Amino acid sequence: MERRRLRKDIRLNLYYPDWDSRANHTELYPQLRVITSQPIGHWFGSSPTKPTKRVKSRVHRLCRRAHPHQPIIVIYSIPNRDLGHYSRGGHKEEKSYLKFIREITAGIGDYNPIIIFEPDAIPHISNMKFEDGFRRLQLIKKSLQILQRCNGRVYVDMGNPKWLKPNQVKRYIDWINEPIDGFVVNTSNYWDLKTCHQWGDKVSRMVNLHYLIDTSRNGVGSLGTDDWCNPPNRALGVFPTTRTSSEYCEAYLWIKVPGESDGTLNGGPKAGRFFLEQALSLIENVGR
């Protein structure tokens, strides 16, 4: 199928949540409102202890509340998610996962959210057996076909700029061969803007698609490829905006929720749980 062409006229109208899910913390630490006042990704996925429920109604309610603005919806529930690591979980079988994708699609309908599709799912293929990786690619292709039925803008995650080589990304996108709106760089990671742009621009020219960068925690860059789990002394990055320094980059977004743990390293709680000390550190280190 023919992909959508590069669009230079894209305008994002991001949704700023009008509720404070961390009210108990912001009362004690008002500086946290720097984080809670921004348009941040809403993650939908299943875990071993928290299966997905009422997905269609939850997605629809979010989109209706946000309208005419665009919420950021992160789909994160592919089978064998995170290959059994800190964020392990996802759906147990492909059939239930595709049902989950159909429910999200139905919940979105004619609304136009920004959809971040499956952080790390494609990069992890490089760590899978051939048959398992091929099966995952087939599942991703089917999922993207379903998501075409809604009006959301779909961006497929391609990991951080030190994971896949640009030609690997091109092979994956060519194989999937579905009309997506772009790809995502640096989801839940810490790499600085210069590194992200160098990699993203190269990929963009190869695949003829624009990209987004997760800047939620990359204000002072990364400590290295192996230090991605709650590294100390990091900082919030550029606040969400469409004013980027690359013609190929549509926006800087906060896809990862700043202050949510990467896993149980460096003093952090389980992945996805609020990590107050990290949140305060991210704020304190801005501009250093």
PLM feature segments, named:
Residues E2, L14-T36, P161-L276:
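Surface-exposed substrate-engagement region within the catalytic domains
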Residues E2, L6-E103, G107, V257-E284:
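N-terminal carbohydrate-binding/catalytic regions of secreted carbohydrate-active enzymes
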Residues G41, P68-V74, N112-I116, R153-Y155, ...:
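Structural preference for beta-strand elements that scaffold enzyme active sites
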Residues H67-P68, A106-I114, K142-Y155, D174-I180, ...:
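Secondary-structure boundary elements
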Residues Y76-N80, I114, C150, W163:
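Glycoside hydrolase catalytic-domain context in secreted enzymes
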Residues D82-S87, P119-E131, V154-N160, V184-Y190:
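Active-site-proximal beta-alpha loop/turn segments in soluble metabolic enzymes
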Residues G89-Y111, P119-N151, P166-Q168:
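Active-site cleft segment of glycoside hydrolase catalytic domains centered on the general acid/base Glu
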